[in-house]
């Protein structure tokens, strides 16, 4: 097999580096095509050409050759080449422009059978345009009006137009080009809106993941099957469209081969007019086909439909919806008089209007659930990071909504310029009052009234002792959690004894530890000396990385498959050994080519062999010994040229490390991978495929496999080892492949045994009990603890006239009516992400924050919990829900997208709690004033006994006991 399968001659590594380097800085342009490449392959290519200045070691070595582009690690299904969910840019894949892709493809080729992963650049944002590559296409459900139960799943780019969808649907449902059609957007089970603007993009139309679209062909008599429904329900004109002058179907649309049964069907009775949504982006008609709603739905108990990974948005919205002062403000239409359409920092009032419309729907008492489609569309226009359908952070969205509502509703029309002032020894009360008044001169809205408090920040210079005190507003408290110090890892230990299966262990290691810590922990459980272990990352049947003992464990992500190999101590005779990576490959004939291909399979091995006086025969015996467990017995006599019994020791850890050191000092340019030297001895080595024999030697026997010297990925051959009459000279950077033909592998290789492993008792034993739950007060104390600024984040001291690593301390000066507490559960580095699942115990009633407020003249700050945003799962994946207290009946409910169920207080405190909403007790609290009359309620609402008793409870101070 040649080194890659590119169609053009490959230039030298310096030229490759220069040409690709210039292209990788290409700016994203709307409509341009970019390609995804598995980051592991791309990193290997960068090492090969010395792309990064800090990684120039062994540039151009054959052993680093990346081979053909291989994206198999990105697919959840190799056959359909469906992308895995939640892939992360730079971590899992890299994006390259078309010209860069074409060069790499010409130089290296692509793994046979793989199609390029090409995606469009789409533009987001209304005022500030933001381009990004649309990695995940939008899945739409398509059906024909006459048969709504047969739904086809089809993928489109958000840059595709409505006309593109219509043309694709004509093709799928065999609708003649001359027959007129109408396209309907079906959502909320039985609500339909007509898509009339053919030039609108999918993004403009606000279509979301899993959206159902219905195509309606015109009847032969010129009428429409839905004409009666439309005439009864819609006052807006509709626009029928034909097929003339339509653009061709998008190359980015692809249809799933499977039919998906959909139980929803059109109900022709009980229609009512739902009106046309504000900013409907081309929806010219809208109507519902559902039964009249029940008059007994409790206002506020309205679920939110998941539009495709939008549970994070639903969770945040449910918490805000159940924030009484804010919801009352919108339901009373107080926002209409305060919309600031001219604020350059605002969104022309459109976020406020979209939010108001959604809140009115949720509190109308008419619907059990609604789809926040138009609100999401508006958010995506102003905040492109939320425009897609990947999982996002509910707290980040919450911060955007609060900031957006504030700017849209800011009562200040012209913000004055105010010079920031330092305390300069003045009393805190004076400086704080000045800071708050200045803040209100520029920021005056219902959000400031409800959510804003004041921090006190103290900086002390370590050199001159200058003290700087400032007061800054905040909208929510982000509280750190005590970081865990340990990490649990699951690894496979591969014993040196070839008869023993790999054993899976669960070990506890320091969170910021080294590979040596992993080996020590594994040694305690296995009894194998840590110095005899080699830790590897196995990926796609090859070694992605072989770790050194001093490397950090942070390089290993939870998704990596870690195999630890036992390497024996130095043999008694003192001979020097080297340890070689060995890959299993199956040789396949390619009808379209005269050269053969090879496919990796199975788990790779580390095999130790003598460094000197190594023959092909002794190498074959060493490998046969190592894989003896995989070989089906009995073997035919023709294969028995050497016994498959374990004999010699399988290697030396000491020489493994020593060889690395030796190779570091070899002179540059010297061949390091495969050399042969003449030997005066009679060697048994030779071409393993030959069956001829020497004149006086024993008859040669058939071999199970042949050897190839390959690159470190196993994807490109460097040399064969057919070296009759010569000794092999290999080194520790050599990589071998043992190549099986398909028939021999099928007959004699035990696939099941090669994949088998045992589980150590550590896998079944309960994990070490985590630290008991921490109290919320511990998080607050951690937040207010003095810290020293890092060397990369210094403070400029006005006295010393230079940057200093000052000490910094936060304190709380004043707290708002609604206190939003963000528990900082997520942490990450460049290699992996982590979530802290620690249970934080927070009071549901009577949270006393007074002791944490440094203004001793302040009012009491006692709060009751009103909502919680929950996150289940790991960072970047998982699911968001919410608990919230309905202010009309005083009961707790659990909101899970469109589902709403009754909950109890003892369910609320869990390890999933992420964002907490507290409402302050005071004379202005809605619980002691006349409640607003909500639509759908009986003119007012009676407070539950629990609410009436709430004001009489004794406030308690948080206690860790």
Curated annotation (Swiss-Prot):
Gene that produces this protein: Usp4
Region (Disordered): 219-257, 641-700, 924-961
Protein name listed in UniProt: Ubiquitin carboxyl-terminal hydrolase 4
Organism: Rattus norvegicus
Ubiquitin-like domain mapped to chain residues: 142-226, 483-571
Pfam families xref list: DUSP (PF06337), Ubiquitin_3 (PF14836), UCH (PF00443)
Region (Required for USP4 activation by providing conformational flexibility between the DUSP and catalytic domains): 229-295
Domain named USP: residues: 302-921
Active-site residues (renumbered): 311, 879
Location of the DUSP domain: 11-122
Signal sequence extent: none
């Amino acid at each position: 097999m040649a080194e890659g399968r590119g169609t053009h001659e490959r230039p030298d590594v310096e030229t490759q580096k220069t040409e690709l380097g210039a292209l990788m800085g290409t700016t994203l342009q709307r409509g341009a095509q970019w390609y995804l490449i598995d980051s592991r392959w791309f990193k290997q290519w960068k090492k090969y050409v010395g792309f990064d200045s800090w990684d120039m070691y062994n540039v151009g070595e054959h052993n680093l050759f990346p081979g053909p582009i291989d994206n198999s690690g990105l697919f959840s299904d190799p056959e359909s080449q469906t992308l895995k969910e939640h892939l992360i840019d730079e971590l899992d894949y890299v994006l390259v422009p078309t010209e860069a892709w074409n060069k790499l493809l010409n130089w290296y080729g692509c793994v046979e059978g793989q199609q390029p992963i090409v995606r469009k650049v789409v533009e987001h944002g209304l005022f500030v345009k933001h381009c990004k590559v649309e990695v995940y296409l939008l899945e739409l459900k398509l059906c024909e009006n006459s048969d709504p139960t047969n739904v086809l799943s089809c993928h489109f780019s958000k840059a595709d137009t409505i006309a593109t969808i219509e043309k694709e649907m004509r093709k799928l449902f065999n609708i003649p080009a001359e027959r007129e059609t109408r396209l309907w957007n079906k959502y909320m089970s039985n609500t339909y809106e007509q898509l009339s603007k053919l030039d609108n993009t999918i993004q403009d139309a606000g279509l979301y993941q899993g959206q159902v679209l219905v195509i309606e062909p015109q009847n032969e008599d010129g009428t429409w099957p839905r004409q009666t429904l439309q005439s009864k329900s819609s006052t807006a004109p509709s626009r029928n469209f034909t097929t003339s002058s339509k653009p061709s179907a998008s190359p980015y649309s692809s249809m799933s081969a499977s039919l998906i049964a959909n139980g929803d069907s059109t109900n022709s009775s009980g229609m009512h007019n739902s009106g046309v949504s504000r900013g409907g982006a081309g929806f010219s008609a809208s109507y519902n086909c559902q039964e009249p709603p029940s008059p007994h739905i409790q206002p506020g108990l309205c679920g939110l439909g998941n539009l495709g990974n939008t549970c994070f948005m639903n969770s945040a919205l449910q918490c805000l919806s159940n924030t009484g002062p804010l919801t009352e403000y919108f339901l009373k239409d107080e926002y209409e008089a305060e919309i600031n359409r001219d604020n350059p920092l605002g969104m022309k009032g459109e976020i406020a209007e979209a939010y108001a419309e959604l809140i009115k729907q949720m509190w109308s008492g008419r619907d059990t659930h609604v789809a926040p489609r138009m609100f999401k569309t508006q958010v995506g226009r102003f905040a492109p990071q939320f425009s897609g359908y990947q999982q996002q952070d509910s707290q980040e969205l919450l911060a955007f909504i609060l900031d957006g509502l504030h700017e849209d509703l800011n009562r200040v029309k012209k913000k004055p310029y105010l010079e920031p002032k330092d305390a300069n020894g003045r009393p805190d009360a004076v400086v704080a009052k000045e800071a708050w008044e200045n803040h209100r001169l520029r920021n005056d809205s219902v959000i400031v009234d409800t959510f804003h408090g004041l921090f006190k920040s103290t900086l002390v210079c370590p050199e001159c002792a200058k003290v700087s005190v400032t007061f800054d507003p905040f909208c929510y408290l982000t509280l750190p959690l005590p970081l865990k110090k340990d990490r649990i890892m699951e690894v496979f230990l591969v014993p040196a004894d070839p008869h023993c299966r790999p054993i899976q262990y669960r070990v506890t290691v320091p969170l910021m530890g080294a590979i040596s810590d992993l080996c020590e922990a594994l040694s305690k459980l296995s009894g194998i000396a840590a110095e005899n272990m080699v830790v590897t990352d196995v990926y796609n049947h090859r070694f992605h990385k072989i770790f050194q003992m001093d490397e950090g464990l942070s390089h290993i992500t939870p998704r990596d498959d870690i195999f630890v190999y036992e390497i024996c101590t130095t043999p008694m005779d003192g001979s020097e050994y080297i340890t070689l990576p060995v890959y299993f490959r199956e040789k396949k004939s390619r009808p379209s080519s005269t050269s053969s291909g090879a496919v990796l399979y199975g788990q790779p091995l580390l095999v130790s062999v003598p460094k000197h006086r190594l023959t092909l025969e002794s190498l074959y015996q060493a490998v046969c010994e190592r894989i003896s467990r995989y070989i089906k017995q009995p073997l035919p006599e023709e294969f028995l040229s050497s016994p498959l019994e374990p004999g010699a020791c399988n290697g030396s850890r000491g020489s493994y490390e020593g060889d690395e050191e030796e190779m570091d000092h070899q002179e540059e340019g010297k061949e390091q991978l495969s050399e042969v030297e003449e030997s005066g001895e009679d060697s048994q080595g030779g071409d393993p495929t030959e069956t001829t024999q020497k004149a006086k030697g024993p008859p040669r026997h058939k071999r199970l496999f042949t050897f190839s010297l390959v690159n470190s990925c196993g994807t490109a051959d460097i040399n064969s080892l057919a070296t009759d009459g010569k000794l092999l000279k290999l080194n520790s950077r050599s990589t071998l492949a043992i190549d099986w033909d398909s028939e021999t592998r099928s007959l004699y290789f035990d696939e099941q045994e090669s994949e088998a492993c045992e589980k150590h008792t550590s896998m079944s034993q309960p994990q070490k009990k985590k630290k008991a739950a921490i109290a919320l007060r511990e998080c607050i104390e951690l937040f207010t603890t003095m810290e020293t600024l890092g060397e990369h984040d210094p403070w400029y001291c006005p006295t010393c006239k230079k940057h200093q690593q000052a000490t910094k301390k936060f304190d709380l000066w004043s707290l708002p009516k609604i206190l939003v507490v963000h528990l900082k559960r997520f942490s990450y580095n460049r290699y992996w992400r982590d979530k802290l699942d620690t249970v934080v115990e927070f009071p549901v009633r009577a949270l006393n924050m007074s002791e944490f407020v440094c203004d001793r003249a302040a009012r009491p700050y006692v709060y009751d919990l009103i909502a919680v945003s929950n996150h289940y799962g790991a960072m970047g994946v998982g699911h968001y829900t919410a608990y919230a207290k309905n202010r009309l009946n005083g009961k707790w409910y659990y909101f899970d997208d469109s589902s709403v169920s009754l909950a109890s207080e003892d369910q609320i405190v869990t390890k999933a709690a992420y964002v907490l909403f507290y409402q302050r007790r005071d004379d202005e609290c809605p619980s002691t004033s006349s409640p607003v009359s909500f639509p759908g309620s009986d003119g007012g609402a009676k407070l539950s006994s629990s609410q009436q008793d709430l004001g009489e409870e004794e406030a308690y101070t948080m206690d860790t006991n």
